[in-house]
Amino acid sequence: METTQTSTIASKDSRSAWRKTDTMWMLGLYGTAIGAGVLFLPINAGVGGMIPLIIMAILAFPMTFFAHRGLTRFVLSGKNPGEDITEVVEEHFGIGAGKLITLLYFFAIYPILLVYSVAITNTVESFMSHQLGMTPPPRAILSLILIVGMMTIVRFGEQMIVKAMSILVFPFVGVLMLLALYLIPQWNGAALETLSLDTASATGNGLWMTLWLAIPVMVFSFNHSPIISSFAVAKREEYGDMAEQKCSKILAFAHIMMVLTVMFFVFSCVLSLTPADLAAAKEQNISILSYLANHFNAPVIAWMAPIIAIIAITKSFLGHYLGAREGFNGMVIKSLRGKGKSIEINKLNRITALFMLVTTWIVATLNPSILGMIETLGGPIIAMILFLMPMYAIQKVPAMRKYSGHISNVFVVVMGLIAISAIFYSLFS
């Protein structure tokens, strides 16, 4: 009896200890969330003045952590280990709702994958012609080489995808922090002049309006919902009934890392420029690094910008691929199940990979202008799945009821509604 108790305690201790795989997933979560959008964040978040920026910095961690923890708990609440988000929604909400949410989930994430395929082609093409002084190959060939390169990592499976992302995080964070430190001597007091509660700098809007419209910017800057389901499934297989505690710990560390590194970079950029500079950068629709390179006449920043963007896009593409694959697989499995058929998962993964390769290549070659609009329409769906669905499940699903009664649930719902309303306002204004 004593031996059994000792071995149980020992196994619990070994499961509660931090593992190498936990670090890998922590960096994988960071890698999915912090993409090339971080290069526009200082402009989009800073143009409204210092007060909204400070408030957003305070809200960033709780907003990101509580929402993603809710979605992770939702995936973990499925009856059977190995059930991803597409299976759990069907289990909790029925076959019809399961199919609809799976469809929405796919169409919210898949366009982001298409945007990344266009973005990496544009960035490499620009880097070759401007920085390297080379004539880039035809767009169709260049995009094919780049997408095949990223899809090669996908062929080695989920573990390899997360490993590749975690490796790419190191140079990305390193360069981001070096840039933030490099800008410190350029800090000036101009941004501090916008420390006013009644106006909000260059936007022409009041404080509350600026803050309201800035919330979605923060939500999507730290959003890594496409990888959450794969993360929860992997950790449940590894840790069993301790998965929820372990996932919460990994999420907390990933989010602390995200908020500290990104907000330090944002504040450093904002403090080194004037509000008029930020407004000019927004008007020109260029990344903060491109603007800084011209503003401080620093060619080294001009060189670094595309390199950082390429690393950022690659790791975010891989993270979003996991979510898009899950959605696509879910639609196929549910469709076949309705006809009484099934498909072997490795065969389905190969079909999905081929579909993703061909469609991302076609879109990257054609570079259609409607793509940005489609991606924007996916915004409210992501916000609903991330913020509202898990909170609804806490009220309605017995397996989730143990998480009810916390003030953080109210906070997540309020932030979700603010984000969704602001997205719709921006779309139709």
Curated annotation (Swiss-Prot):
What name has this protein been given in UniProt?
Serine transporter SdaC
In the record, the note on similarity to other proteins reads: Belongs to the amino acid/polyamine transporter 2 family. SdaC/TdcC subfamily.
Annotated membrane-spanning segments are 23-43, 47-67, 100-120, 141-161, 164-184, 202-222, 250-270, 298-318, 348-368, 370-390, 407-427
Task: Summarize the activity regulation.
Answer: Serine transport is strongly inhibited by KCN, an inhibitor of the respiratory chain, or by CCCP.
Q: Which GO terms describe its biological process?
A: amino acid transport; L-serine transport
Q: List the disulfide bonds.
A: none
Q: What happens when the gene is disrupted?
A: Disruption of the gene leads to phage C1 adsorption defect. Mutation does not impair vitamin B12 utilization. Inactivation also leads to increased ampicillin resistance. Mutant is resistant to phage C6. Mutation also confers resistance to ColV. Deletion mutant lyses upon glucose depletion in the absence of exogenous serine.
Which function does this protein serve? Mediates the import of L-serine into the cell. Is energized by proton cotransport. Promotes amino acid homeostasis during adaptation to glucose limitation. May also be involved in ampicillin sensitivity.
Q: Where in the cell is it found?
A: Cell inner membrane
Q: Does the keyword Hydrolase apply?
A: no
Q: Which GO terms describe its cellular component?
A: plasma membrane
Per the record, what ranges lie on the membrane's Periplasmic side? 44-46, 121-140, 185-201, 271-297, 369, 428-429
Give the organism, scientific name: Escherichia coli (strain K12)
Record membrane topology:
Multi-pass membrane protein
Which transformation does this protein catalyse, written as a reaction? L-serine(in) + H(+)(in) = L-serine(out) + H(+)(out)
Gene Ontology MF terms in the entry:
L-serine transmembrane transporter activity; symporter activity; transmembrane transporter activity
* Residue ranges annotated as Cytoplasmic topological domain: 1-22, 68-99, 162-163, 223-249, 319-347, 391-406
Briefly describe its induction. Answer: By leucine and by growth in rich medium. Repressed by LeuO. Part of the sdaCB operon.
What are the protein's UniProt keywords?
A: Amino-acid transport, Cell inner membrane, Cell membrane, Membrane, Symport, Transmembrane, Transmembrane helix, Transport
Alphabetical list of InterPro entries matching this protein = Amino_acid_transport_2, Hydroxy_aa_transpt
Tell me what gene encodes this: sdaC
